[in-house]
Amino acid sequence: MNRKIVIAVAFILSACAVSAQLKEFALTDEWVQKIEKLAPAKAEVQPKKHHKVLVFSLFTGFDHWVVPHTDAVMKVLAEKTGAFEVEFSKDIYQFEKKNLKNFDAVVLNNNCSVGPRRDLLLDVLDKDKNLSDDQRKKKAAELESNLIDYVKKGGGLMVVHGAIVMQNNSMAFSEMVGGSFDYHPVQQEITLELCEPNHPLVKAFGGKTFVHVDEPYLFNNAYTQKNFRPLLYMDTSKLTKKTKEIDEKIKYVSWIKKFGKGRVFYVSPSHNAQSFEDGRLLKFYLDGAQYVLGDLKCDDSPMKMEDNGKQ
């Protein structure tokens, strides 16, 4: 009898783990209409000027099925609130200096690169047979440098989920974004806590946790410096199916930071379009976009190292 109970419990736990892998679905007009209804009616701050935002959605590595849904979310937020105008592109030459000047901010949408090199720009340039190997490497470095300089000089940058992998082995890119992708345990239900419940950037959550199914991203490189203002965190002791021990109980999954004269917003949620079916995440995205555009003012001073892991 006891053995049967153990087997039954094991089966239930296994079923729960499998169910955490949400079903993918194609972007449809019906889904977009649902998002339009859930999205904020107006922006938190009325923009003082017209903003144009580049949404870059090219990937060469892992194909996140949520890419078109994330594009749609940014379009809905822009059109419904009038907070900014969006232009979509998968052309790396948008990172030429003359082109970046046309935008007030850039949104990087799940731009996963091919491992282990992890250089999306070089992935694309490798296909250009008119260039030598040296020319490809030089151009890739130039385009990356252009984006970094753009933010340093005052441009905004919003980095969504897997986009942190775009130039994952570049320390310069890591320092701009606030970290690099390390790995993630399997998809599972994650409870995201608010680092500062009264911070303007987490107003969307109304002081409550945000529970959803996602990949629990963990980070390295510049992340260890904690040179950012954390917004959301997860308790790693509650994660399941960890392939190795995690060094800190608290890991941040979203933050803001100054970078030169510019502003950066990293948001790990979400791998799944279902997460956007909660209006709170839509407002969080909108507020983050308004932050990088300079409209939503808030404390973005870096956390103190001695505060790491304390809430």
Which functions belong to the PLM regions below?
Residues M1-L22:
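Bacterial Sec-dependent N-terminal signal peptides
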Residues Q21-K48, P68, V76-T81, K238-T240, ...:
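Extracellular ligand-binding/catalytic regions of CAZymes and related secreted enzymes
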Residues V32-A39, S174-E175, G179-G260:
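Catalytic beta-strand/loop cores that center a nucleophilic Ser/Cys/Thr
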Residues H50-G61:
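Short beta-strand segments enriched in small/hydrophobic residues
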Residues V53-L54, L100-Q167, K261:
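Short alpha-beta junction capping motif
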Residues F59-F62, I92-Q94, N111-G115, L157, ...:
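Solvent-exposed loop/turn segments at secondary-structure junctions
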Residues T60-A72:
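Glycine- and acidic-residue-enriched helix-capping/strand-helix junction motifs
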Residues G82-E96:
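A short, well-structured beta->alpha microelement
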